[in-house]
Amino acid sequence: DAAEQCGYPKNADYNSGEQEGFGYFQVTQKNGRRWSTAKAFLEPALKRPNLSLEINAHTTGILTDGGRATGVKFEQNGKTRTVTAAKGVVLCAGAVQSPQILELSGIGNPNILRQYGIEVVHPLPGVGENYQDHYMVRQTWEIKKKITLNEQTRGVSLIREALRYAFTRRGIMTYPAGILAGFVRTRPEIATPDVQYHIAHASFLDVKKRILDKHPGMTISPCQLRPESRGSIHIKSSNPEDQPAIKGNFLAEEIDRRTLIEGMKIAKRIASAPALKDFVAKELNPNEEIQSDDELLDFARERGNTVYHPVGTC
């Protein structure tokens, strides 16, 4: 209702083709549990005769012959193993480790490969470049009434919810991190939304430690949907056990900064709407004194973090 009072429609299905508006998050769940692609698709297929699954296997490189991928090398239970491909190799290690595996295999920017003593199998400078991600800023408010997860996940309430989940597979333990989603256009001339909101009836005292505030709280987190800033992900040694170096380079482009600032202002307006007057006690982070664009940008740089939607690296 608060978003609608600010001029944004309600939207019960943001995957219908019309994305703009606010509504409940759509989730992938079964019987109250978050359902992964492994659960939904891989496990049911494990009995097929043409599928073999190796677990506890760490890929260390792609085998090549004459510029063609012919297999994969991996470590498993302290031993080095290889598998060969009759037709082809599909690399699907995500935006972080796919470029790492390619570079360890000699596929990538020759300057980077030679720096770590890796023979160049195929020069491909784009590997590891073009990294982009959604950058989110958590804005929080204190709530007047005890209706949030901050107090519902403590003491007797938590025990009651645990029992409710155990017997009915319902309740707060089935909730996603944010229960409401919003998609808005920060400028009227653009065709589709450029900011998404994750809205939670909870607030963190310490995000990294996942500690909730002791008082009732609410969080509205905007992120820019189509960032222009680009980072990189590259190996930092020839050792497959070493994690790659990730350079986010978030908010490097002016359009990213302007869009996120406007997204934060919209969140402030929604929290100040009449529909939330009886619920919102005060603005916490950024506080009510932080209003200018420069102040909001400083807050975004200090408190923002990735939503872990990395793409673009190979």
Where are the predicted features?
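Glycine-rich loop(s) and the adjacent beta-strand/alpha-helix scaffold that form part
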Residues: 62-67, 71-164, 172, 238
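Alpha-helix boundary recognition
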Residues: 4, 43-47, 103, 114, ...
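FAD-dependent oxidoreductase catalytic-site/capping-region signature
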Residues: 1-16, 23-25, 144-147, 162-314
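Structural detector for helix-capping/boundary residues
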Residues: 40, 57, 87-88, 314
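General small-molecule cofactor/ligand-binding pocket signal
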Residues: 11, 52-54, 119-123, 198
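Short aromatic/hydrophobic-glycine micro-motifs
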Residues: 8-10, 51, 107, 118, ...
